[in-house]
């Protein structure tokens, strides 16, 4: 199986580079980023951006914004918060980049309100949401719902593609965390096919910006490998929502070669650091795993002010560690061809 996947990957790369030798470059500002909470207000995030404005070891920020807050009615968008973040980042004394992560679920919700635009809750979209193990998540395996998520990504991509401080877009994690029995029509293959549609559409909308698909789990290693192939073909970035030393997600297993070809020199790679791993590991242990094993280029560190002891919190643990300039991979990934620094 490994030999077959490696051969298939080699052929894919050959075809890809033959077809896209003159492809335009992609913005490339790898490094350590601070990641804000979905529940942080715009004003709070703007204050926090000022606090890290002079920190040379921090390359930028990731903001997490709910789909509901970005699309106020079908096809009507409110990007005022994104505009404000970019303006604040440009005003800082050191260069800072922006990654926007679109949130299409709520892990702890008891109500469907405020997650996706209200029109999606109609029968046209089968209610738009489905119950997950702990909350609600958009029905992303269904083409009608994915069509609307693609429309949102496309609108953001087209608006900010030309902004040099806009590093790109990120998704929520690929797993939907559904309980069994699965909803009618759901399968790993169906979900993977819709993610591939998203990857292709976003690259068309923003050819020089990054698109971070949070490939943590999708239920099938072969489907996950197919997603890596689609990211290769479109010059997208694989990612994930956690960095847990010695405990890889399915996506991390695939890109490090546990099931076949090793993608670490070929794909742009990223992952977030959440409070779960900070309870068990120090920032240095997490970074060592990310650098030596996962070989990621972008790390999004949660601005943790509530979990763990002082060594795991932002002001007293994470930020002091980042000031030591811990190593991170910066090489332009093979699939990108040209990186714009």
Residue positions per predicted region:
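Bacterial N-terminal signal peptides
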Residues: 6-17
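An active-site-proximal structural segment forming one wall of the substrate-binding cleft
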Residues: 85-92, 96, 129-170, 194, ...
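Aromatic- and acid-rich polysaccharide-binding/catalytic face
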Residues: 58, 63, 68, 207-217, ...
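Aromatic-lined substrate-binding rim segments of carbohydrate-active enzymes
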Residues: 48-125, 187-201
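Substrate-binding cleft of secreted/luminal carbohydrate-active enzymes
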Residues: 99, 103, 236-341
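Aromatic-lined carbohydrate-recognition surfaces of secreted/lumenal glycan-active proteins
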Residues: 32-39, 165-176, 196-223, 241-243
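Sec/Tat signal peptide C-region and signal peptidase I cleavage site
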Residues: 17-23
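Boundary/entry segment of secreted carbohydrate-active catalytic domains
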Residues: 23-59, 64-66
